[in-house]
């Protein structure tokens, strides 16, 4: 009666409203069942010290049948779930009574070895003898079962073998397919040229030089020319060689010709920096490709792909050295036939954390147009940071004794003095000498997290010096806040 009264009062169609209520009840029921399933899975994994977040990730992949699936083969966790290692899957398997010589264990171990070494060293394959030696050592089994497992994985198509003369190269199918598809796409693009007269390009360069009050070197001008003439281009060079100047010139020249330009970089920080120096919006590659919830066979789903390509005439990717082969596969998938791809980076800088050393391999292949910048410009020559970067690259020792420049070395015999020395540099010496603000204009980089000079300890010390608590400050310490739905990216909080 209550529903009928409400329906008549609101002038709604009765049958339609009942259908809405029915759908709502079904949605509530599905959500309830899902939460029950998640709770059971979290409790199941809790005894193996698997975090709730990882357990939820497992549920999203395998659904309500997760527990029997894992009990039947725990190694699917290492094979298919990012964040769950082979060691953890092996621990679960041993507790469930799996044998050390079982095929599923050895096969999963082999795949994890290829993944791990690929991520560490930038490889996409390993020599067969290397895999066998690593597997025998890690799994503590004899060579015969390992060779049998490799043969079965090759027959099933999970691994791919290519003869390299002295040895067989063994790939995960994922890496093999990605590398092949990227290579084929880039080679096709390298054969595409755009019919535009060099004198027309030079006129555009002259106009940009005049407006921006800059003067390009001949090598830089050639890079801009090739950006107009070819569909795939690499621009590489060390620090201070003018890569950013070229990017800006290409952007402004392309805009004069009414070309739609997009900028992207592998990380949020690199994209932010690119935006700042170019005065033009840059996105992370994941954001550019419109990453969506869920995973596919290569770990992520993107709305932009071969069926829904990026709508641009020119795509410029900075910090290409950090792009791995899987991300590159997604990126090239999303390029339309009209899009020029300009890859900018220094192959001697930070490599990707994933498999593949994409930029270096592209340069070494000599299959893609590549402009190498070697001249260090006047302003960069005055920086000992740039000079020493090139010295190290050339196998020379850095110059450490110029305390009047922007690169100097501070020696301490006692490691316990290091935190206070770093704090003194940030609070007193650098701000006084260079006129910098200790909070907004100085960064401290450290390779560790938990040591004496690690992130956690230094942050505590620097906060107490640079931003100490005060009754005058409108702040209080509370529980951590989790952002679940905001346009906030990693390291921006």
Question: Model-found features: residue ranges?
Answer:
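Positively charged, polyanion-binding regions of nucleic-acid-associated proteins
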Residues: 105-124
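Helix-hairpin-helix
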Residues: 1, 15-28, 45-59, 76-93
């Amino acid at each position: 009666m209550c529903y009928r009264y409400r329906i008549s009062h609101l002038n709604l169609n009765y049958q339609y409203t009942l259908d809405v209520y029915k759908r709502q009840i079904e949605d509530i029921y599905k959500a309830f069942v899902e939460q029950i399933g998640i709770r059971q899975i979290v409790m199941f994994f809790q005894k193996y010290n698997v975090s709730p977040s990882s357990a939820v990730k497992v549920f999203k992949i395998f659904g309500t049948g997760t527990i029997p699936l894992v009990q039947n083969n725990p190694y699917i966790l290492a094979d298919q779930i990012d964040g769950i290692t082979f060691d953890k899957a092996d621990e679960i398997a041993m507790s469930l009574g799996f044998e050390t010589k079982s095929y599923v264990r050895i096969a999963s171990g082999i795949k994890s070895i290829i993944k791990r070494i690929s991520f560490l060293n930038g490889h996409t394959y390993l020599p067969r003898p290397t895999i066998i030696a690593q597997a025998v050592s890690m799994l503590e089994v004899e060579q015969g079962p390992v060779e049998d497992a490799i043969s079965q994985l090759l027959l099933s198509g999970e691994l791919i073998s290519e003869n390299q003369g002295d040895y067989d190269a063994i790939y995960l199918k994922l890496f093999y397919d990605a590398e092949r598809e990227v290579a084929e796409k880039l080679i096709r693009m390298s054969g595409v040229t755009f019919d535009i007269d060099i004198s027309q390009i030079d006129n555009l360069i002259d106009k940009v030089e005049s407006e921006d009050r800059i003067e390009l070197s001949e090598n830089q001008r050639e890079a801009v020319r090739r950006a107009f003439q070819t569909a795939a281009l690499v621009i590489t060079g060390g620090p201070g060689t003018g890569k950013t100047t070229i990017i800006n010139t290409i952007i402004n020249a392309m805009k004069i010709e009414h070309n739609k330009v997009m900028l992207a970089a592998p990380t949020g920080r690199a994209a932010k920096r690119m935006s700042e120096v170019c005065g033009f919006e840059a996105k992370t590659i994941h954001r550019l490709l419109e990453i969506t919830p869920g995973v596919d066979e290569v770990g992520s789903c993107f709305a932009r792909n071969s069926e829904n390509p990026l709508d641009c005439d020119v795509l410029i990717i900075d910090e290409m050295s950090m792009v791995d082969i899987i991300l590159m596969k997604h990126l090239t998938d999303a390029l339309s036939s009209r899009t020029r791809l300009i890859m900018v980076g220094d192959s001697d800088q930070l490599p990707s954390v994933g498999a593949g050393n994409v930029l270096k391999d592209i340069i070494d292949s000599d299959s893609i147009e590549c402009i190498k910048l070697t001249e260090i410009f006047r302003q960069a020559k005055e920086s000992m940071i740039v000079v020493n970067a090139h010295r190290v690259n050339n196998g020379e020792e850095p110059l450490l004794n110029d305390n009047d420049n922007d690169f100097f070395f501070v020696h301490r015999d006692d490691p316990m003095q290091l935190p206070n020395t770093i704090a003194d540099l940030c609070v007193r010496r650098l701000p006084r000498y260079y006129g910098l603000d200790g909070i907004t204009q100085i960064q401290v980089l450290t390779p560790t997290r938990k040591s004496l000079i690690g992130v956690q300890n230094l942050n505590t010390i620097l906060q107490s010096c640079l931003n100490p608590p005060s009754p005058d400050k409108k702040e209080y310490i509370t529980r951590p806040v989790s952002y679940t739905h905001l346009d906030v990216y990693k390291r921006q909080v």
